[in-house]
Amino acid sequence: MPEKEEFKREYLESIAQNCSKPFAECSRMERYIALAAMIRECCSGVRAETLRRRAANNEKIVYYFSMEFLIGRLLENYLILLGIRDMTAEMLADLGEDLDALLECERDPGLGNGGLGRLAACYLDSLASEDVPCVGMGLRYRYGLFRQRIQSGRQTEEPDDWHADGYPWENAVPSEAVDVRFGGHVERREENGRMIYELCDYQVVRATPYDVPILGYGAHAVNNLRLWRSGPVHKQLDLDAFNAGDYSRALKANNDAEAITCLLYPDDNTPSGQRLRLQQEYFLVSAGLQSMIRTFRSTGLSWEHLPERVAIHTNDTHPALCVPELMRILMDEEGLSWEKAWDITCRTISYTNHTVMPEALEKWPVQLMQDLLPRQFQIIEEIDRRWRESFDTSVPGWHARQQATAVIGGGSVRMANLSVIGGHSVNGVAALHTEILKNTVLSDFYAVSPEKFNNKTNGVSHRRFLLQSNPGLAAYITERIGDGWITAPEKLEDLLAYKDDTESLRELAKVKLAAKEKLCAYIARDFGIACSTDGVIDVQVKRIHAYKRQLLNAFKILALYDRLKDDPDAAVPTSTFVFAGKAAHSYAFAKESIRFVCAVADLVNSDPVVSKHMKVVFMENFGVTMGQRIYPAADISEQISTAGKEASGTGCMKFMMNGAVTLGTLDGANVEIRDRVGAENISIFGLTSEETERYTTQGGYNARECAESDPVLARVLAHLTDNSLGSRFWDLEDALLKYNDEFFVLRDFAPYLAAWDTLAAETGNLSFHRKSLINIAKSGWFSSDRAVGEYVTDIWHIR
């Protein structure tokens, strides 16, 4: 990399080129854009060399299809990966500019929602750092999911215009645009003894790629994230309608095409919403596969070699249409037989399942699929027919198993079944999750094809969530064990040598305090709530959902509130409870949960006695950058989902990496955290997955009985409807008592409160900091470097 003066000269040239005026006259946003453009150009040079080297070595490429890529801000991340963050800060200081202020100009790209998208981004980071050829295939959403606002305690949604000021990291590639076809009908004819299928009277949408460089640590390799934007093939204007004043009809064709990539996850509670969702999924698949095929064709190899040169990975079921679409291309466009096309498809495609909740497994109405994708539906029908015929009818129970695993059933196309049948690998994302898939959710498939199933426990980028997010802790670690952990995170275990070193534990406490001071200053500035830096910082940040049980956390806070109202001198540690996360636009229960948490916050924060001991903060519009502010400061990581419902979770890993101690159920990755840190360095409570499954399938759970037998809980529940919160929450009470508490909030309340009391009382002690250090030391296994290494070896067969 260049020396500072050379770097400064190049930066000022970038200012002149991008802003056409002197540095002193540029706004801070313009200065940021010029710096980002300069770093992107640096990435482009590395990318060209990476492509040349890989082509010479005939390397296999992973195409990672995902509806979400939550990549977060890139400038600081790339300065760190290039090893020039400090030099850049000095260079800017020489020019009278502050790097930290400049970094705040960058907005989080609205390319995802939660763990699914952040996992994909972490994997891209690790694949580039490990020099594994990969192209991420996603959509370039105009307005993302939404920008969350909390107004009078209620979530409201606004469009997230994340690239209103431009996005300097992307590069449009119109020369590689492709056309995607929807609707129409299929005509069949025979030519030279072969059946030809031709789609007629279809609508065409243009897919234009925007490439974002994905830089690996040390700048040894750059991969590509290709985001597709939808639009009309030609801009169309109905002049008659326009001149008649019907402007919406005049632009309808343009608007319909652009709507496909307008928003992430449009509401699918209406037929038009379902249609748009399915259009999104096929648009991604069609555009991505066309791009992949363009690259493969350049090798000159025959199609039989595709599985040797390409791995297509589908991140959840959203890209499941890769199966029939690849079949269509191989048969209809390349002339392969069904048998050859099927063999190639199955050996090329693999699938990650991300849910244990059957209702969350995607299904699409047969009629919708038939209308929107007529040829693909024909292929799906044939896949279904051949699958059904493969069953041995002499085996007892064959019919029930056939019905459970069929692609088409109950008037729907089952995308998870399509993904399992049409690929060579199905993986869960935590050991417990994979066992649940084998034993319940996908048990019939496991009985038929056990060799397809494997576990790949999730991982997160320690370079993003430790090295970048927590520079104080990173320096603390490097001072003791060197910097080898940055590229070999398993070396974090060397920290265990300091677990009984009093001075090191005290230094670790100072690092945590500095992180708390930073977070509390941010909360005071942006949310107007003054929090204590000396007390416990207890955090639950994740998507708002009934099974994630934000209600349970809020009930605990109310129990502590009641305790302090009875006795202001009660032994309740000074605490700040932090919540963040979005509720899906149409998910009423989740929105009501946010309103409830905000009402609890108002009650606690406005009470002159209780607020001296506790504060509650709901931080609106949670995203990657906000998470990076929060993770370093947390003492207690709330991972309290109903056991058996969380596939894995990655927030738990980010908190662990930053020294928080997990308070959680035996669910998802919590199980593996416990196995690595030891039961004494994590706080586990509540029902197990076996117990929740038994209650669900056999009955015997009585929520009302739980409420009536526990006076503390009964008093907490009274807050729901006694107007002490300034409002009544009848729907929440009904969910718990009338509908028997589907997620066992009331059953787990008492052990949860007891576990919190014990853990919170220990924070601040050397024994707690010892637990914290052990968690950091054992977090290396949860790096995405380890996870992608397993995918590379076991699923994609690259090395």
List the predicted regions and their residue ranges:
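A conserved ligand/cofactor-binding region detector
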Residues: 1-799
